[in-house]
Amino acid sequence: MKRTSKRILLLAILAIIGHITVTAGAYKSFKVSIYVRAYEVNKMKDIQWLDSTWNIISKQLDVDKIYLETHRDLLIVDDATLNQAKEYFHKKGIETAGGITYTIDESNSFETFCYSNPEHRKTVQEIAEHTAKHFDEFILDDFFFTSCKSDIEIKAKGDMSWTEYRLKVMTEAGRN
């Protein structure tokens, strides 16, 4: 009897999933947006890869908007790839916007930029300008923070706590 109950439960779950899949695209109360990391956006230079990957996604989900990340871990997606990806999605009636993840190396304890370092600030600005060149709208991934404790940071921190110092630095970085 337990086995029959499990089968009935499994069939009920599959029926619900099937119903959700069939009715996908009939969204009335919300829009669906997805975020694509720079690693995958960079692969979009291969139109066959893009098309086959998008076919898998679009069979499962009716997407209204896609955020194409332009930078992550010092990988900057080139202009030609971004233009090709934007054109591909626009032809399908999908809005595009940009995204940025300000990391240097995620695998190294989420190494981020040091916002008191003028060279890092210059790179961050170049990434933002590169993204703004392609998109009227972009978002920052949740890596807009710093955990840097370089000599520059230690000197700039002075007598402030790390929390006070980082709040000050990131507020200023966000504004400028």
Question: What residue spans do the PLM features occupy?
Answer:
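Bacterial N-terminal signal peptides that target proteins for export
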Residues: 1-9
